[in-house]
Amino acid sequence: MFELSDNLEINTEIFQGSKIFTIDNFYENPDEISDYLFKEPAPLHKEYDNPTYNNVLFEDRRLRTYDVRLQPVINFLSKLSSQKPLLYDITTNQTRFNDDEFNDYKNCIWWPHVDEGYNGIVYFNKNDTECGTNLYSEITDVSEMNDYDNIPEHFAPWRQKEKYQKIKTLIPEYNRLVLFDGYKFPHGMNIINDRYFSDEYRNNQVFFFERA
């Protein structure tokens, strides 16, 4: 199921002293995997958080399930990132938005955050080369830092653009993997148009690793 393409070409970029890896045509059979992962909507992410606008003004869904067939992929990315896997589960993101002024992507960015270590993302939307992943400078605004500590993610996920400095955008492409240091770089999905203000979900598969 999760066979990698033969003769993978790994592009390595050094950005601010950190390696960012990009691999196009990552999976041998991406359509089969996409059908397997995204045939049905995944459960709501953080569905028990309160207060929340998830499934009210937008849908943020995540599949978490174990599949032993994914282990060789995780081991490959672990070796590439030189970090241990944080988990071995299949993990996905599925996101779409209501047409509501709350979802103000023109003036706001979606929930910049950091993770435990390297992140891998495989993009699964065809003909989308815009809504990828943004990397930001370190978050230093005190009010923003307090919000992250005290406000549930899905209650105020949109943050004012002027409070963040975007330093790089990782460009999406169907069946492209990007692997970057999600602890070093605050990051979040790059919503810059209304493509996913519809029945279509923004779909990707994610991998998490942890620094030593």
Feature roles, as predicted:
Residues 98-212:
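Catalytic core of non-heme Fe(II) oxygenases with the double-stranded beta-helix
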Residues 1, 5-7, 120, 164:
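Intrinsically disordered, low-complexity regions
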Residues 2-110:
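Non-heme Fe(II)/2-oxoglutarate
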